A protein has these predicted regions:
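Lipid interaction determinants
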Residues: 18-166
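Bacterial N-terminal signal peptides
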Residues: 2-15
């Protein structure tokens, strides 16, 4: 009986994976994803984690082609005054280093297995109006990994892991 249960479970998992693979890349990206980790690899091979070991965040792909993305480091300084408009320069700097938020539109290239985001607005205003393309390295019903091949200022490439929100 155990063998039958194990075999049935394995077949169900394979069928689920095959069904997911038959959908378009865009259809598989749609929805809400929780940010798990970002790992940047510098040109010299050195790795860093710009949002720390336990970041928080979300990436949303809407069917009409809009996206919203927020990445926050696990440890962002609190503002002592409790007034977001009256932080110290050090508090503002710590917050800026540990967060990024942006929204805009996206397109998907099914053949290349990439998606390109056009930034309408960002907490890093230099990105506004720009395009950034990410490769889709892994995409299942539960997990999504993409790579940004060119992190700003020649810092290398970034690997980003997300888990689907449930």
């Amino acid at each position: 009986m155990k063998l039958v249960t194990v075999a049935a479970t394995a077949l169900a998992m394979l069928a689920s994976e095959a069904s997911a693979q038959s959908k378009s890349l865009k259809d598989r990206l749609l929805g809400t994803w929780h940010f798990v980790i970002a790992e940047v690899t510098a040109p010299d091979g050195q790795k860093s984690f710009p949002f720390g070991p336990k970041p928080r965040g979300i990436l949303i792909f809407a069917p009409e082609g809009d996206f919203a993305q927020i990445h926050i480091a696990g440890e962002v300084p609190k503002i002592a005054s409790s007034n977001r408009l009256a932080a110290t320069p050090e508090e503002y700097a710590g917050i800026m280093r540990g967060t990024i938020a942006q929204f805009g539109t996206y397109t998907v290239d099914e053949d290349k297995q990439t998606f390109t985001m056009k930034f309408t607005a960002s907490t890093f205003p230099n990105w506004e109006g720009t395009l950034q393309t990410r490769s889709v390295d892994k995409l299942t019903d539960e997990e999504f990994i993409n790579t940004n091949p060119q992190v700003g200022a020649g810092r290398g490439s970034a690997y980003n892991l997300y888990r689907r929100a449930r």
